[in-house]
Amino acid sequence: MSNDKKIVITTRDRVLRAWQNSTELVRDFENYAKETLDDKTAAEMFQKYAVDEGRHAAELLKLLHSYQDNGAV
């Protein structure tokens, strides 16, 4: 197999994957918070993590939009 056609992973690709991971973590942490009925401390921790991860996802999405607006698609 020839190595003359390498796949290039861009920063935008990495940001997109990070955003996808982040949104998935938000859903996971929200579900964990709802499902954790036996430990209020853990449920509150999961809810806090969901909010924190939501902020990360929003920042990543903002960066993705800036890439799109500047033609880095």
Residue ranges and their predicted role:
Residues 1-73:
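Iron-associated oxidoreductase/ferritin-like identity signal
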